[in-house]
Amino acid sequence: MEIAVIGKKEFVVGFQLAGVQKTYSAETPEKLAETITKVIEDENVGILVLQNADLETLPRRLQVIIENSVRPTIVTL
């Protein structure tokens, strides 16, 4: 299982420096939603890290999927 991080460049860069390989920069709410959907479907991702402020910009339908996700486990900071 791998860790994936999605967010603005400033958010993901620290995780890149820590060695997380699956980092995705998403600067717009549309790109964020698209990337989250793609990563949730990746069976190799066990933990998905998001910024709490980004979660609030997502469509409600995707927020519900995130709130109910067991795998990957989604952590907001």
Which residues fall in each region the model found?
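N-terminal first-folded block
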Residues: M1-K31
